[in-house]
């Protein structure tokens, strides 16, 4: 919206700065962060009153989690509110990538909200039917992937390789849908400790903001020999808003958390990162930048698969952050060490931009 005022620079000195993606990205960060920080306390109070007992605690989980009883969930509403308002204020409202990404984020958030609602009202850790939930997620992701295919190419870029793309054809749609749904649920699995998921999400958002900016600039894309995608640079503004909202949310989600993100936030943010990786043609790089989420998901797959084969467990509990809880690590140790892993993996992912 503010981009409109840049056309009035002859009458309003200084508004020309609104043309620059870098300026609007920083402005989006500050705006979303301020929104979440200022309105967070009232939202938390409202959710606490409405939810009563708060998010139910798993009976088979670590004993230390029972002290979290009564903590409200659906904190993703705070994040999504800040992101949407900030993105609409500072983003280019004529950019298709912005709208497709918001579409995925909000619909995944709605699915997560319904899941949280069922868990809170029924006081059970079993929410929305798994099959129904996945079906809706794949439907939303497929629609978004189809739209991106209409405005872009069906190519899959490979890191470390110069100017080589695999033409996926119509297979681009199911492949992209799997990326979006996979990451949405991967972030959801990671969100099991206070502050554990939000910082890696912020790290990934900042990393993909840089990738989107470079991929959307023909000069930088040519220099780095990465796939140029016209208009995708606008996603840097949206991802900047995610980073800012994440900072605001971390203020309340830091141990001991005053509120949990819930499926409302984790599904929405994971789905958003997934569709951004598709739009920027960096789906494979997502494996590195979102590496912590991948590791958490793999731990669940390994645990379930091995148990079905041998009736034995590889980990004391999955996802893997619970394994370390059972090993005696404190929650703060796990969270901070996993943050470090997320940052290192993101740096490795960003290094692929130059290593070709």
Curated annotation (Swiss-Prot):
Q: Which cofactor does it need?
A: Mg(2+)
Location comes to:
Cell inner membrane
Note the InterPro entries from the entry: Glycosyl_transferase_4, PNAcMuramoyl-5peptid_Trfase, PNAcMuramoyl-5peptid_Trfase_CS
Entry's Gene Ontology molecular function annotations:
metal ion binding; phospho-N-acetylmuramoyl-pentapeptide-transferase activity; UDP-N-acetylmuramoyl-L-alanyl-D-glutamyl-meso-2,6-diaminopimelyl-D-alanyl-D-alanine:undecaprenyl-phosphate transferase activity
**PROSITE patterns, per this entry?**
MRAY_1 (PS01347), MRAY_2 (PS01348)
Residues crossing the lipid bilayer are: 25-45, 70-90, 93-113, 138-158, 164-184, 195-215, 232-252, 258-278, 284-304, 333-353
A Gene Ontology biological process term: regulation of cell shape
Spell out the GO cellular component terms annotated for this protein, sorted alphabetically and separated by semicolons.
plasma membrane
Q: Which class of enzymes does this protein belong to? A: transferase
Which pathway does it take part in?
Answer: Cell wall biogenesis; peptidoglycan biosynthesis
Q: What is its EC number?
A: 2.7.8.13
Tell me the membrane topology, using the record's own terms. Answer: Multi-pass membrane protein
From which domain of life does this come? Bacteria
Q: Which catalysed reactions does the entry list for this protein?
A: UDP-N-acetyl-alpha-D-muramoyl-L-alanyl-gamma-D-glutamyl-meso-2,6-diaminopimeloyl-D-alanyl-D-alanine + di-trans,octa-cis-undecaprenyl phosphate = di-trans,octa-cis-undecaprenyl diphospho-N-acetyl-alpha-D-muramoyl-L-alanyl-D-glutamyl-meso-2,6-diaminopimeloyl-D-alanyl-D-alanine + UMP
Going by the UniProt record, its keywords in alphabetical order are: Cell cycle, Cell division, Cell inner membrane, Cell membrane, Cell shape, Cell wall biogenesis/degradation, Magnesium, Membrane, Metal-binding, Peptidoglycan synthesis, Transferase, Transmembrane, Transmembrane helix
Record's keyword annotation contains Cytoplasm: no
Task: State the protein's purpose.
Answer: Catalyzes the initial step of the lipid cycle reactions in the biosynthesis of the cell wall peptidoglycan: transfers peptidoglycan precursor phospho-MurNAc-pentapeptide from UDP-MurNAc-pentapeptide onto the lipid carrier undecaprenyl phosphate, yielding undecaprenyl-pyrophosphoryl-MurNAc-pentapeptide, known as lipid I.
Q: What family is reported?
A: Belongs to the glycosyltransferase 4 family. MraY subfamily.
Q: What is this protein called?
A: Phospho-N-acetylmuramoyl-pentapeptide-transferase
Q: What is the lineage of its organism?
A: Bacteria, Pseudomonadati, Pseudomonadota, Alphaproteobacteria, Hyphomicrobiales
């Amino acid at each position: 919206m503010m981009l409109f005022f840049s056309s009035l620079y002859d009458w309003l000195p200084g508004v020309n700065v609104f043309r620059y993606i870098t300026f609007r990205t920083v402005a989006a960060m500050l705006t979303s962060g301020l929104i979440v920080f200022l309105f967070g306390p009232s939202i938390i109070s409202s959710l606490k009153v409405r939810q009563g007992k708060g998010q139910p605690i798993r009976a088979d989980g670590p004993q230390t989690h029972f002290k979290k009883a009564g903590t409200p969930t659906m904190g993703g509403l705070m994040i999504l509110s800040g992101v949407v308002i900030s993105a609409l204020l500072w983003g280019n409202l004529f950019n298709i990538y912005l709208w497709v990404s918001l579409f995925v984020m909000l619909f995944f958030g709605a699915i997560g909200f319904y899941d949280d609602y069922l868990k809170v009202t029924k006081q059970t850790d079993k929410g929305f039917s798994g099959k129904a939930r996945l079906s809706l997620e794949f439907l939303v992701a497929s629609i978004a992937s189809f739209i991106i295919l209409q405005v872009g190419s069906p190519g899959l870029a490979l890191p470390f390789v110069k100017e080589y793309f695999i033409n996926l054809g119509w297979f681009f749609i199911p492949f992209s849908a799997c990326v979006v749904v996979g990451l949405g649920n991967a972030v959801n699995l990671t969100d099991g400790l206070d502050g554990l998921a939000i910082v890696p999400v912020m790290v990934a958002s900042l990393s993909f903001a840089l990738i989107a900016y470079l991929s959307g600039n023909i000069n930088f894309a040519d220099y780095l020999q990465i796939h140029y995608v016209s208009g995708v640079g606008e996603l840097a503004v949206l991802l900047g808003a995610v980073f800012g909202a994440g900072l605001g949310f971390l203020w309340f989600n830091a141990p001991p958390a005053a509120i949990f993100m819930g499926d409302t936030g984790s599904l929405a943010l994971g789905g958003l990162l997934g569709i951004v990786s598709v739009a920027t043609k960096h789906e494979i790089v997502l494996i590195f930048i979102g590496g912590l989420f991948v590791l958490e998901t793999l731990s669940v797959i390994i645990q379930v698969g091995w148990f079905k084969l041998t009736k034995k467990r590889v980990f004391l509990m999955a996802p893997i952050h619970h394994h370390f809880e059972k090993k005696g690590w404190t929650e703060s140790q796990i969270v901070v060490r996993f943050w470090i892993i997320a940052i290192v993996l993101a740096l490795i992912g960003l290094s692929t931009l130059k290593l070709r």
